[in-house]
Amino acid sequence: MIAIDTNVLLRYLLTDDKVQAARAAKLINGSKTVLVTDIALVETIWTLKGKKYGMSKAEIIQVILSLFAEPNIVFEDSQTVWQALYDYRQAKPVTVAGKRKEADFPDALLVNKAKYGAAINGEVIEAVYSFDRAAGMLPGVTEP
């Protein structure tokens, strides 16, 4: 198994640097299992949603689905990432200070990692507390 960082994953997804994209593809399409850590996934999504790339929610969903379709790519906990993707898709927008806002995929992953962390410790998460009103639309999130 190998792991890749955010930059390798971005070059693979965007193919915006031909040399680095080819090297990234060689790793990802090689003979080894490729771990995409939660941190690399979250940083990738933040970058893709940011000013430079400006990807929409629908595009982010497609990117994550495409990673699940890659035969060599695995996540730290695929079930948690999958549930986070589901919650992200289902989250309703809220209006904050007159602007429409939606929970981000990293918010959904944080909530689901909290649930997973509690479960592996024999607990059930009572709530994930956040001041982010959009994140508050995710199952299990409440304001303190």
Regions flagged by a language model, labelled:
Residues 52, 117-121, 142:
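Active-site catalytic pocket residues across diverse enzymes, especially alpha/beta-hydrolases
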Residues 130-136:
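Short, polar loop motifs at secondary-structure junctions
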Residues 45, 49, 65-68, 85:
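Amphipathic alpha-helical segments within well-ordered protein domains
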Residues 5, 36, 103-104, 132, ...:
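Histidine- and aromatic-rich ligand-binding microenvironments
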Residues 1-36, 52-62, 124:
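Short, well-structured N-terminal submotif of metal-dependent ribonuclease cores
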Residues 72-129:
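Active-site neighborhoods of divalent-metal-dependent phosphate/nucleic-acid chemistry enzymes
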Residues 38-46:
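Short, conserved active-site loops that position catalytic residues or coordinate cofactors/metal ions
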Residues 138-140:
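Short glycine-/acidic-enriched loop or helix-start segments at secondary-structure transitions
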